Amino acid sequence: MENTQKNIEKNLQSSKKHSYNLHSPGVRTYKDSVFCRIFNEKKELLSLYNALNMSHYENPDDLEIITLDNALFLQMKNDVAFLINTNEMCLIEHSSTVCLNYPLRSLLYLAREYEVILEQRNENILKYGLVKIPTPACIVLYNGIEKRPEVEILKLSDAFENQEVEPCLELFVKVLNINDGMNENVLNGCKTLKDYVILISKIRENYNEIGDLAKAIHKAVDYCIDADHLRSFLIRNR
């Protein structure tokens, strides 16, 4: 059963690399994950940000999506990156596994983002005055089958080979478990995220019953449309 579940996750998560069609067979390549497609819209992304931070931003134009081109940056791929009010940079990744290298990947990703931002702002880091940069936040939304805590903090310093020396650099990645019963304040604060979790849960449930991924997706999509979970998105993409 565990191996079967892992195969489901592998098929579902393969959508992060390939073109997306809700009723494509599992072998068909996908371009973007469902998650990326949903939260590539500023309105939905702002709702997610507000839920994660208990904030109340209302204007989607306060947000600027700055996700790097995956074709150029495959090793540091992130689902979505954005600026809020130009002074905070948020990296969000959705995953069915918890990768202990998230902090290192985030460090490299942030460095590239800062390089782009400084170039766009025509900043010179060799000048005497302090160059200000957006404050970073790195978040992973986890909904895999492995039991994990509600909240985990992964640290870059755990990767340092010499643990006896106090490091001059640190980076934290917050991992939020969004499975049923976990972080309900976040899910209740963002209906779209909650609907997405329901969709994935239904696909898993259906796959366990019928053993066919394409049919499992089809059945889950029909259910979610009827129940008004991601209805507009699913109708557009079915």
Regions found by a protein language model. Give the residues of each.
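Elongated, amphipathic alpha-helical interaction scaffolds
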Residues: 2-238
